[in-house]
Amino acid sequence: MSFWNSLSITTRYSRLPRCFFTYVQPTPLDNSRWLIWNSELAKQFDLPENVHNHSELLDAFSGETVPSVFSPLAMKYAGHQFGCYNPDLGDGRGLLLAEIKDKKGNSFDLHLKGAGLTPYSRSGDGRAVLRSTIREYLCSEAMAGLGIPTTRALGMMTSDTPVFREGYETGALLIRMAETHIRFGHFEHLFYSNLLEELKLLSDKVIEWHFPCCLGEDKPYLAMFNNIVDRTAYMIAQWQAVGFAHGVMNTDNMSIIGQTFDYGPFGFLDDYEPGYICNHSDYQGRYAFNQQPRIGLWNLSALAHSLSPLIDKSDLEKALEQYEIKLHDYFSQLMRKKLGLLSKQEGDTRLFESMFELLSQNAVDYTRFMRALSYLDSQDKQTVVDLFVDREAATLWIDLYLTRCKLEVDSFDMRCSKMRKVNPKYVLRNYLAQQAIVKANEGDFSDVKILSTLLASPFDEHPDFERYAELPPEWGKRMEISCSS
């Protein structure tokens, strides 16, 4: 039995009609070699922890040899990009290789990004560059470390293949894992193409594969949509609580199971700046940090329109009305945890709002503030107060906060201990990613490996790596990132 045949691998998506995808063989890069292998993630799927003794892994994931159990395909979908419908989308550089089951029996997609040309590449070359591959690997693992729903990265490879973007860069490959790669845009493609039988089939399969709890409902398609609304609200609440800006929330970048998906021009907040724009192509600020909750609703409305042949309009409207309620509830729960507040009290929302106003007015680093708050000593507030220009206003807010804390049953030490488990010391600031990329382009991958370790456990102190928790230099603040990948 071959190595791959010994694993639990399926190809369910390839059994769908051909309007869903096109079979495509990967095009190998020159001299592909491992840059990093996620051994902790690999263990969950009975994959080797060390890739260097397993040439089958290199051959398969580089595209040199496609195992017989794989059925590489490029998915067809559509989507609204910056609010405009685009029917000509699909996997332009990535291939769904197969699905693999973890030790608990859950199926995950094996997806190869940077695999070469597909029928949906449009004017692209089907490649991914080292720069964007490093960013996606690090951010997906950072989000996993933070406990935020996300796709994962099993590994990445570098190569000797030059790829032209603004200049010549190094071609690379990312092995992405997700419970599904089905996007809002899959439903939009079928709806706008008037493929209504296929739309129903996709909905049936999504329920079967990802929302089996809906099978016994009187209105299973509505139940599916309610679940998508709920998961999307939870995901975006998590983004807002941790200070994450996705950067390009097009509907083709929205997962139907509420996982953070397609890492491109993302950014974590440095100074608390509500209108932070991380995508330098977002001239109008459509996807600014403080617009993400609104765009979540816009995208869900676009999905609802695509599901209208299956679900009554009034039911869709009621489901959409729940989004903002759910988002507010999830966000409030998360902020209470970050502030060490277990009980729900009148005035909590105003406490949060006044905190955000103060952080914004004083340009205080969001991650550093929340972490410092988890060490706050009621007898010595100075460490937190010193983060602010307006120390008097900061002192007033801290006094309000400490008064609120007295309503809790936890001791001071217990409360702070819990806060340190939800307020990270380390996040993937864009300047850290950029420094790692610069080194990697020179053949030094040490920062990539250090960051991948730190970001997997971002709440721990890691005293030997304090410099990765430092404030960004001026050049590293408010970095806007290109969509080029």
UniProtKB/Swiss-Prot annotation:
Its EC number is 2.7.7.-, 2.7.7.108. Its cofactor is Mg(2+); Mn(2+). The active site is at D252. Keywords: ATP-binding, Magnesium, Manganese, Metal-binding, Nucleotide-binding, Nucleotidyltransferase, Transferase. It comes from the Bacteria. InterPro entries: SelO. The keyword S-adenosyl-L-methionine does not apply. ATP binds at G90, G92, R93, K113, D125, G126, R176, R183, D262. GO terms for molecular function: AMPylase activity; ATP binding; magnesium ion binding. Mg(2+) binds at N253, D262. It catalyses: L-seryl-[protein] + ATP = 3-O-(5'-adenylyl)-L-seryl-[protein] + diphosphate; L-threonyl-[protein] + ATP = 3-O-(5'-adenylyl)-L-threonyl-[protein] + diphosphate; L-tyrosyl-[protein] + ATP = O-(5'-adenylyl)-L-tyrosyl-[protein] + diphosphate; L-histidyl-[protein] + UTP = N(tele)-(5'-uridylyl)-L-histidyl-[protein] + diphosphate. Transmembrane segments: none annotated. HAMAP family: YdiU_SelO (MF_00692). Nucleotidyltransferase involved in the post-translational modification of proteins. It can catalyze the addition of adenosine monophosphate (AMP) or uridine monophosphate (UMP) to a protein, resulting in modifications known as AMPylation and UMPylation. PANTHER family: PROTEIN ADENYLYLTRANSFERASE SELO, MITOCHONDRIAL (PTHR32057:SF14). This is Protein nucleotidyltransferase YdiU. It comes from Aliivibrio fischeri (strain ATCC 700601 / ES114). The lineage of its organism: Bacteria, Pseudomonadati, Pseudomonadota, Gammaproteobacteria, Vibrionales.
